[in-house]
Structures are given as structure tokens and as C-alpha cells.
A protein has these predicted regions:
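N-terminal "arm"/small-domain region of PLP-dependent enzymes with the aminotransferase-like
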Residues: 1-61, 69-70, 403
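Short hydrophobic/aromatic beta-strand micro-patches
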Residues: 222, 344-346, 406-408
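Well-ordered beta-strand positions enriched in small/hydrophobic/aromatic, beta-favoring residues
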Residues: 151, 219-221, 317, 343, ...
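Conserved N-terminal alpha-helix of the aminotransferase class I/II PLP-enzyme fold
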Residues: 39-91, 113-120
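PLP-dependent enzyme catalytic core of the Aspartate aminotransferase-like
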Residues: 78, 119, 128, 146, ...
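Active-site beta-loop-alpha junctions enriched in small/polar residues
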Residues: 156, 185-187, 322, 348, ...
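Conserved small-domain helix->loop->beta segment predominantly found in fold-type I
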Residues: 271-274, 278-280, 285, 289, ...
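Conserved PLP-enzyme active-site core in the AAT-like
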Residues: 14, 18, 80-310
């Protein structure tokens, strides 16, 4: 199946044939908590991981399984684990890697929730992080310690769409025996596949572009299957016999899919951030049109960026497609199809002007989500990043006049007219 092109894979992987029980062509919603074993030996084999398949609804579900297969194929990974939210996917990944007082080197311009997790929540459990200018490889390397467990980046930083050099960071991580973890929520596998550039683990908030319609929470961890968990001795949770799973070493039981298998069998088992079958179904509906939506998002974004860049009431547009953006060359390298539909601009003035602009929009919805088919807007400094101190906001490139846009798929003339109405209201 993987020989097919992206547009075909997004429709068929995981259900190449109709449902064998009902001949249904659409993926069924399997609303069940449990699964009947054929006999006692079959049950024991499932629990011992020697026979892959459903055990209990907290761990696996047949609708969820199709979603996992499909996203793994689209990202070029060996396996995936779908979870209840993007926050769960990121948390489980970092907890699995960082246990026993681990440390991360992280891009400093990342989603506010991920920043708070690394800067404030995980340190309560002995896991720490150093935030770096991800474009300065010397600074990144200098931040690596004996207990560092991974380098963590986003393909497109939230909210300013800054772009790391994934190839270079993967080489640096591997030089030190570390995995590179990449959040590809804003990139999507249609625009960029981080595993092809050396990433070892990819995470998503599937709530965003993968689902695409603002209806469903979900998260995904994709395992490249390429990282050697045994080589450094730093990852006993994955490589060593696990006392809470009758001595199973996941690298032996699951082979190259050891990382996501460990998270499913241990962290998901014990803490239960399970995706519902209905949520998995809705995300699958979104993925079926991913390429079509992303093309329209990219086209509309290009025209909005041009409009804002030439507007007299705009102080600055933070979009990597612009030649004067510091990551323009990286944008051309990693995003030949375009993209970066979530970005910020700075309106002339301050917080009052930003709020008046936002409150005057009609088509753009003021809400915390992004990557919806509907156009969205928010003021990061007083909402999504409001937990950050002023210095932290500055480090993230956020000012009081910063406005974040998420460009939808409406007609471009209506989008531009709505933005102009906002500017007119500020000037009035």
C-alpha cells in the first residue's frame, strides 16, 4: 500500500478492503470496551505481546487502529499511537524519554502549552529542559548534558512560524546518541515528513490540520523505527526488562516499534489518555481531505501575507515566505508546497489596537484553536501565552501588538475584506 501516493494513502491505508464483518466501505465506529479472546492461550499471547491485537479499549480499538496505521503511513513511520489530545501525545513522549531525572534541549519558540510543560510541570517530576535558539547549532550542542534525553523542536514554531533546520539538528542529535523529537502539527505530513530528514519521533495535535474542522480532540505519536534504544543505555524503559510487564524488554518484544509500544503498554495503561472510537472516526474523515484542504490553506495564506505585508497599518509580518524573514531559505528547502497558515503579524500600536482589530472581525472567529477550515484569530499575549512572563513572551517573539491568524478555506476576497474591516475599525 505504501507504494501509492499521498492522496491515495490518506483515503485507504488501514482499510484497503471493506470491513470483513459487514462489508462496510467506511471505517466503522467500534463502540466496545472489550474484545473476546478465542481461548485462554490466545488471551495469554495478547497480554504477552506475542500476538498483536486488541486487548482492552483503554489500549486499542479497531477504529483507532485504522487511524494509527494511516498516520504512520503518511508520516513514513513504522507505527503510531493515537491519544486523547495533542497534549497527551507530547506529555507521554517526554515522560517516556525523560524519566529518571532526564533533560531536554528544546526550541525556545514553541507552543505555549509545550513550553509550560517543559518549563514548569515536568520539573516537578525531576525532568528539566534548556530552551535554546534552535538556529544556533553551537548553542544547541552546548546545552546537551550527560542526562539529556532528546532534542525537541517544531517544524513550524507556534505562533511565529519559525523553521528549524531539521537535517542539521538530526545529525547533531545522533552525534550525541539522542533522538530528535519533532512536533509536526503545523507542518502536516502533506507539506513535510520530518522522518525523511532524520527525525526519530514525530508528534501531532491531530485536533489541528489532521482533523481540520474544529470538532475533535486527538493526538498522535509516530515512531520512525530507526532509533537504536539500546546503544546508549539511556533508555531503560524501552530497552531493559520492564518489571511492571513481567520482565518484557520492549525492544525485544516489539522490535523497531518499541517506543510507541512501551507508551501504549505502560503509560497509556496506567494513566489512560485514551482516544474514543468516535474521535478516531472523525479524525479519519478529516484526513481523507488533508491534501485538498492544505492546498487551499496555502493558496489563501500566500494572498493574505501579501496583503498584510503591503498594508500601512501593519508594522511587521512574521511569515517565512517573505524574503526578509530569517528562515526564508529554510522555508524554501522544507516547504516547497507552501504552507505556514498559522502565523502572526504586528499591528501598528499596542494591545488596545490589537484588541480593537480582533473584536471588529466578522468571518474570523476569536478562539484558541488553529488549523481549522474556518479562519481564526487570537491575541497570544493575553490568551494562549498569557501564563508567560514578559521576558518569556519576548523570547517567544510575542509582543502586545502581536496578532495570530489561522487562515481558513473561505473565499479569499471575503477573508481580505474582513481583515480590511478590522483595520478600518482601528483607524476610525
Amino acid at each position: 500500500m505504501n507504494d501509492y501516493r499521498f492522496e491515495t494513502l490518506q483515503l485507504h491505508v488501514g482499510q484497503e478492503n471493506p470491513d470483513p464483518a459487514t462489508d462496510a466501505r467506511a471505517v466503522p465506529i467500534y463502540a466496545t470496551t472489550s474484545y473476546v479472546f478465542k481461548n485462554s492461550a490466545h488471551a495469554a499471547a495478547r497480554f504477552g505481546l506475542s500476538d498483536a491485537g486488541n486487548i482492552y479499549g483503554r489500549l486499542t480499538n479497531s477504529t483507532q487502529d485504522v487511524l494509527e496505521q494511516r498516520i504512520a503511513a503518511l508520516e513514513g513511520g513504522i507505527a503510531a499511537l493515537a491519544l486523547a489530545s495533542g497534549a497527551a501525545a507530547i506529555s507521554y513522549t517526554l515522560e517516556a524519554l525523560g524519566q529518571n531525572r532526564g533533560h531536554f534541549v528544546a526550541q525556545k519558540t514553541i507552543y505555549g502549552g509545550s513550553y509550560n510543560l517543559l518549563a514548569h510541570t515536568l520539573p516537578n517530576f525531576g525532568i528539566t529542559a534548556t530552551f535554546v535558539n534552535i538556529h544556533d547549532l553551537a548553542e544547541v550542542e552546548a546545552a546537551i548534558r550527560e542526562n539529556t534525553r532528546a532534542i525537541y523542536i517544531e517544524t513550524l514554531g507556534n505562533p511565529n512560524s519559525d523553521i528549524p533546520d531539521i537535517d542539521a539538528l538530526a545529525a547533531l542529535a545522533h552525534k550525541h546518541g539522542l533522538p530528535l523529537v519533532v512536533d509536526n502539527t503545523f507542518g502536516t505530513p502533506y507539506l513535510i515528513r520530518p522522518i525523511e530528514h532524520g527525525a526519530d519521533i514525530v508528534v501531532h495535535s491531530a485536533t489541528k490540520f489532521l482533523g481540520g474542522h474544529g470538532t475533535t480532540l486527538g493526538g498522535v505519536i509516530v515512531d520512525s523505527g530507526k532509533f537504536d534504544w539500546e546503544a546508549s543505555g539511556k533508555y531503560p524503559a524501552v530497552a531493559a526488562p520492564n518489571p511492571s510487564y513481567h520482565g518484557v524488554a520492549f525492544v525485544k518484544a516489539a522490535g523497531p516499534a518499541a517506543f510507541v509500544t512501551y507508551i501504549r503498554a505502560i503509560l497509556l495503561r496506567d494513566t489512560g489518555a485514551t482516544i474514543s472510537p468516535f474521535a478516531a472516526f472523525l479524525l479519519l474523515q478529516g484526513i481523507e481531505t488533508l491534501s485538498l484542504r492544505l492546498e487551499r490553506h496555502a493558496e489563501n495564506t500566500r494572498k493574505v501575507v501579501e496583503f498584510l505585508a503591503g498594508h500601512p497599518q501593519v508594522e511587521k509580518v512574521n511569515h517565512p515566505s517573505l524574503p526578509d524573514h530569517p528562515d526564508h531559505a529554510l522555508y524554501q528547502k522544507y516547504f516547497p508546497k507552501g504552507g505556514a497558515s498559522i502565523f502572526t503579524f504586528e499591528i501598528k500600536g499596542g494591545q488596545a489596537e490589537a484588541h480593537k482589530f480582533i473584536d471588529s472581525l466578522k468571518i474570523f472567529s476569536l478562539l484558541a484553536n488553529v488549523a481549522d477550515v474556518k479562519s481564526l484569530v487570537i491575541h497570544p499575549a493575553t490568551t494562549t501565552h498569557s501564563q508567560l512572563e514578559e521576558k518569556e513572551l519576548g523570547n517567544q517573539g510575542i509582543r502586545q501588538n502581536t496578532i495570530r491568524l489561522s487562515i481558513g478555506t473561505e473565499h479569499i476576497d471575503d477573508i481580505l475584506a474582513d481583515l480590511q474591516n478590522g483595520f478600518d475599525a482601528v483607524r476610525a
